[in-house]
């Protein structure tokens, strides 16, 4: 019937934006990402203990690490903390830059939320930072944000 009426999945999504297909094709990272003061960000020279406090306060399960130019240069997650503790890292004497994951997966704000789900599943990650064209953090989102949006 869709073919006979020349009605595409995109047309259906626009006609039914609240439905599952509509959410998959019409919700973008920019629609669900945390921005501004809600972004968990520290510099690479921040102590791991202070970085953990910021990560806990922002409640995304991750923290972005920026360099001196404000570019995202790394990420540190709840899982990274567990691995650090297992390796005997002293959170009181360590800078987050020495234990961060360099070159994290990032996305532009125009990425469809459904594509973010695929990226997260493919790389077994729970969150991702949104960056602008220059590589500066513009937002962040995690799996719970996608579930709340009805995309996951």
Task: Give short role names for the model-derived ranges.
Residues 1-7, 17, 57, 86, ...:
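Generic secondary-structure signature for well-ordered alpha-helical cores
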Residues 74-77, 138-142, 146:
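Short hydrophobic beta-strand motif reused across regulatory alpha/beta modules
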Residues 25-39, 93-104:
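Bateman (tandem CBS) regulatory domains
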Residues 56-79:
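Internal helical hairpin/lid segments
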Residues 39, 72-73, 82, 131, ...:
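Short hydrophobic beta-strand segments in globular cytosolic domains
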Residues 42-59, 66, 85, 106-125, ...:
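The conserved cystathionine-beta-synthase
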